[in-house]
């Protein structure tokens, strides 16, 4: 790889938290970029300590934070606001189960990345490590696609301005960001890829 990971994974501007649904879409895009990097790193033949360290940091910090965002804030709001025809309980139950499995898989990925750094070896040098990272990336992409296709449209439809403002504040507080008033974005096209 010729460029640093930060150049390949977009950072979300703090101001995007003014529209938390658009922020989740952008955050999901970042996670897909992370998965792409992890896939590429899993087959790289050379030892790339900066990349491996960055992947490790993302797994430890960003992934855990994202699960908290959804489990403690977004999902409870959706359960409270969804209509019966939304059939949200089964969907959120499935995603919560996936989050639990994701955290277990992330712990294994973390150990693999730490081992690579400690031994100064590429991920691809060990089939167990390589397959673990590839499987994690594949599962994460599928999970994100389901959230984008089903959860976020329901959130956009059902959450009130007050819900969105509270969600925005909670997401910002978890990141120690001072927030301005939240609301619905009229132009979230840039983050809906």
Description of each model-found segment:
Residues 1-193:
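Small-residue-biased structural context
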């Amino acid at each position: 790889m010729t460029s640093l990971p930060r150049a390949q994974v977009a950072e979300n501007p703090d101001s995007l938290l003014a529209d938390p649904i658009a922020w989740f879409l952008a955050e999901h895009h970042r996670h897909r970029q992370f998965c792409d990097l992890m896939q590429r790193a899993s087959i790289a033949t050379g030892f790339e300590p900066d990349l491996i360290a960055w992947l490790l940091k993302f797994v430890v910090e960003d992934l855990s934070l994202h699960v908290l965002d959804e489990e403690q804030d977004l999902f409870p709001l959706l359960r409270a606001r969804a209509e019966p025809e939304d059939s949200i309980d089964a969907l959120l139950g499935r995603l919560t189960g996936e989050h639990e499995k994701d955290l277990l898989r992330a712990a294994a990925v973390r150990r693999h990345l730490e081992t690579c750094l400690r031994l100064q070896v590429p991920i691809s040098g060990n089939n167990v490590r390589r397959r673990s990272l590839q499987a994690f990336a594949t599962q994460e992409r599928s999970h994100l696609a389901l959230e984008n296709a089903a959860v976020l449209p329901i959130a956009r439809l059902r959450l009130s301005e007050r819900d969105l403002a509270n969600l925005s504040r909670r997401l910002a507080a978890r990141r120690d960001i001072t927030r301005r008033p939240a609301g619905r974005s009229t132009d979230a096209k840039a983050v809906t890829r």
